[in-house]
Amino acid sequence: MNLIRNEFMKTNQVIKSLIFVLACVIAARFLLPANWTPILALALFMPYVTSNKSIQVLMPISILLLTDIFLGFYGQTMFFVYATLILIAFISRHQSIGSLLSLMKHSVGSILIWHIVVNFGVYLNGHDGSSLAQTYLLAIPFDLRLMGSTAFFSLIFYSAWATKEHFRSSIEKA
């Protein structure tokens, strides 16, 4: 009986994950403005969701890949985008789980990493003669929107997680 229950729970978790991936792809493609995406917040939040380190990296990467399939691919800069997302997913493992302050610090830090690495890739692949400083400067408005969305979605994910944890502890006490 426990084997059946465990298999059902695993299947249920996979279905929930697929629905979440689909919802993020649809939101990023059809509902949200440019540079307003849950992808970085998800990469930061995955350690709250699962201890499986592969899933922590593969979930945000799969959402980004599916979104890129719909939106279109964008050349060699993609390497920097995907590498940065993987780096952020690895760094997120070192935050204090359960701490909103830690999550927000990692949100800001991830945007700084994103700004430095991805825009360096834009500079390397650019053909308009812009300087590196100019590339970083021109990216600030886009990255500020990305910071706003990362903080916003991190708060939403954290609120949902904290609510679930509150109800779980209430049920366990009863």
Please give the residue ranges for each predicted region.
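Hydrophobic transmembrane alpha-helices
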Residues: 2-48
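Hydrophobic alpha-helical transmembrane segments
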Residues: 15-20, 54-58, 79-83, 104-108, ...
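Central hydrophobic cores of alpha-helical transmembrane segments
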Residues: 21-22, 56-67, 103-112, 174
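Interfacial aromatic-anchored transmembrane helix boundaries in multi-pass membrane proteins
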Residues: 26-37, 61-94
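Structural signal for the C-terminal ends of transmembrane alpha-helices
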Residues: 27, 46-54, 90-99, 159-168
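Non-cytosolic membrane-interface motifs at loop->transmembrane helix junctions
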Residues: 43, 75-80, 133-142
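Small-residue-rich segments of transmembrane alpha-helices in multi-pass membrane proteins
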Residues: 47-52, 73, 109-117
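Membrane-embedded alpha-helical hairpins and interfacial helices in multi-pass inner-membrane proteins
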Residues: 99-174
